[in-house]
């Protein structure tokens, strides 16, 4: 039995509340169990210098955790004067995952920045940020279409992500912190709406695992992402 009482193939309770902030072109509060992430999408009619004049847009991401999003307070990275390697890795992952789901040429010469702020962390913050990031991005693009700034929809696919792992020898879906901290193996899967893979991050923490173990995690992730896709569709309908 999992610490949460869930079955091995069961997601945590998932909710997506859109329009959570007033000013951003797209926003949502996404919750997987006790993990809660506020995601906003902000439109800027400018591009990084290396992209100017190339006839395409850009989607980038920033990620951060509130000081008391975890069991004990952590100093803000701004107070430390630099971002951690973990933060940089996660925000790059979010950005490239979301770029896989959009035609940057159809976006035009503008940038959409996805800001992911972890309000409460209980495992799976990066995957929640990606899944919520797509919702915020979709909402921002909808505004561009409604205003006539875009005449063609640049979104080519939904994007969602979920964690899986091997806990006490059993492959499980959507690890919370209690499971993640003791898992023999863990993985993050990012998928397109048709279940094609965008990214896989997998590592053995306690013991190596074989190819069949990885495939079992992949099958769980595909099942979980299908449920997330359904919730995303409801949120942006």
Swiss-Prot record:
UniProt key word Repressor: no
Biological processes per GO annotation: rRNA catabolic process; rRNA processing; tRNA processing
CDD domains per the UniProt record, alphabetical: RNase_PH_bact (cd11362)
GO molecular function, a single term: tRNA binding
Catalytic reaction list: tRNA(n+1) + phosphate = tRNA(n) + a ribonucleoside 5'-diphosphate
EC number: 2.7.7.56
Keywords, in A-Z order: Nucleotidyltransferase, RNA-binding, rRNA processing, Transferase, tRNA processing, tRNA-binding
Pfam family, one: RNase_PH
InterPro entries associated with the record: ExoRNase_PH_dom1, ExoRNase_PH_dom2, ExoRNase_PH_dom2_sf, PNPase/RNase_PH_dom_sf, Ribosomal_Su5_D2-typ_SF, RNase_PH, RNase_PH_bac-type, RNase_PH_CS
Positions annotated to bind phosphate: 86, 124-126
Entry keyword tRNA-binding: yes
Task performed by this protein: Phosphorolytic 3'-5' exoribonuclease that plays an important role in tRNA 3'-end maturation. Removes nucleotide residues following the 3'-CCA terminus of tRNAs; can also add nucleotides to the ends of RNA molecules by using nucleoside diphosphates as substrates, but this may not be physiologically important. Probably plays a role in initiation of 16S rRNA degradation (leading to ribosome degradation) during starvation.
Family the UniProt entry places it in: Belongs to the RNase PH family.
PANTHER family named among the record's database cross-references: EXOSOME COMPLEX COMPONENT, EXOSOME COMPLEX COMPONENT RRP41
Subunit (UniProt): Homohexameric ring arranged as a trimer of dimers.
Protein name per Swiss-Prot or TrEMBL: Ribonuclease PH
């Amino acid at each position: 039995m999992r610490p949460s009482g869930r079955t091995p193939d069961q997601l945590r309770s998932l909710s997506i509340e859109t329009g959570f902030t007033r000013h951003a072109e797209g926003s949502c509060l996404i919750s997987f169990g006790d993990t809660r992430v506020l995601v906003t999408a902000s439109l800027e009619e400018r591009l990084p210098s290396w992209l100017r004049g190339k006839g395409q847009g850009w989607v980038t991401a920033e990620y951060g955790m509130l000081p008391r999003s975890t069991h004990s307070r952590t100093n803000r990275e701004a107070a430390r004067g630099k971002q951690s390697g973990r933060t940089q890795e996660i925000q790059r992952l979010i950005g490239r995952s979301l770029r896989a789901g959009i035609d940057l040429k159809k976006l035009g010469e503008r940038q959409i920045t996805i800001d992911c702020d972890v309000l409460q962390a209980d495992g799976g913050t990066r995957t929640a940020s990606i899944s919520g990031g797509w919702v915020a991005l979709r909402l921002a693009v909808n505004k561009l279409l409604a205003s006539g700034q875009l005449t063609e929809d640049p979104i080519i696919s939904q994007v969602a992500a979920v964690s899986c792992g091997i806990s006490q020898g059993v492959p499980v879906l959507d690890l919370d912190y209690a499971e993640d901290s003791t898992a023999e193996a863990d993985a993050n899967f990012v998928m397109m709406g048709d279940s094609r893979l965008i990214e896989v991050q997998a590592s053995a923490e306690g013991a190596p695992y074989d190819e069949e173990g990885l495939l079992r995690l992949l099958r769980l992730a595909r099942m979980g992402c299908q449920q997330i896709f359904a919730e995303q569709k409801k949120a942006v309908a």
